[in-house]
Swiss-Prot record:
The keyword Transferase applies. Glycosyltransferase involved in the biosynthesis of kanamycins by catalyzing the transfer of the hexose kanosamine from UDP-alpha-D-kanosamine to disaccharide precursors. Can also use UDP-alpha-D-glucose as sugar donor with much lower efficiency. This is Alpha-D-kanosaminyltransferase. It comes from Streptomyces kanamyceticus. The gene is kanE. Its EC number is 2.4.1.301. Belongs to the glycosyltransferase group 1 family. The keyword Manganese does not apply.
Amino acid sequence: MHLLVRALVEEMAGRGVPHRVLTMSPPKVPKDIRIGQRIKVHARRLPVLPIPSDLEGYFGLVGAWAKGSLLWVLRNRKRLRREIGARVHAHCDGSGAAAFYPYLMSRILGVPLVVQIHSSRYLSQHPTTLFERVTDPIAKWAERHAVRKAAAVLMLTDRARDEMRRKAQLPAERVHRLAYLASDQFKDADTEARRAELRERYGLDDRPIVLYVGRIAAEKGVEYYIEAAAELTRRGRDCQFVIAGDGPARPDLEKLIGARGLRDRVTITGFMSHEFIPSMISLGELVVLPSRYEELGIVILECMTMRRPLVAHDVNGVNKLIEDGTTGIVVPPFRTPEMADAVERLLDDPELRERMAENAAPLPAAKYSLSAAGDQLAGIYREIGL
């Protein structure tokens, strides 16, 4: 289960709302588990061919989950109608299947549909492979159809909310902004012991760390971070570059690191459990967000919470969250020299880093708390009669 999905499910379960969660079926994980008294998790998917995809890991993986979940709903529809009788709440990642199959489930069960868009194929995602270009019109249609049929649509930013209202021709009262951190106690997980453990585990010394946190996937643009690292190295900067994450594009990224002669400067941690992320961020002097598209970027809020400035591509809604020169630096996308310049500017000016961190620190708690998101979602459920 995705971290943000689990956080919201547990928040709402704590308010008395029972959940059945249909998620991926990883190897060697029980297909049916219970979390507390109000959460039941069912992991289902059909088999897929091992054809790599930078977007999904394997081609058709999200569709295989969606079809497997739909079959489970069909087989259990009588029991679900009696037991749930409330809503289907879909968390959408930019694939058409993640929106369309929950729409079918809502029709089968005769309940309202709530669509929560974490990444939108219809509004912002762009295909990166031939297969994705071929299927892109279908995926866009599927997402658009689902949001038009939904009782409520939840977007990450005001910009995305307004654009979805306009493009999908939806009434304003059906489309809302909902964004939140996975924990209101995120900063509390940072400890000196965890920082020391991370330094020892990954061989990090006292040189400045320029950090990337997130998935290694096509849409995240991590190759631009590597190109900036190469440019900074050519300029004589003695930095450590740490990629805290993993993902389907890692093999290609490792080839690029080798081609740029950076194997002794770049560390890829692989998957990192969430309790270590605050300490990893605190080890960095700054964090780079090189995404090709990014409506919100939860890592932005996490870095603000940990008082670390960001250098980010000016894509989608990023400049609505990072005020250039005040709470971070926003650079033109896909231009290595400008990104390297911004990183150097922050490395050379500790007072600027501290000032940006000070300006940004209050924002996450003020506008993106998990408890406030729970209040808002409870209100939305009431509005649609749940």
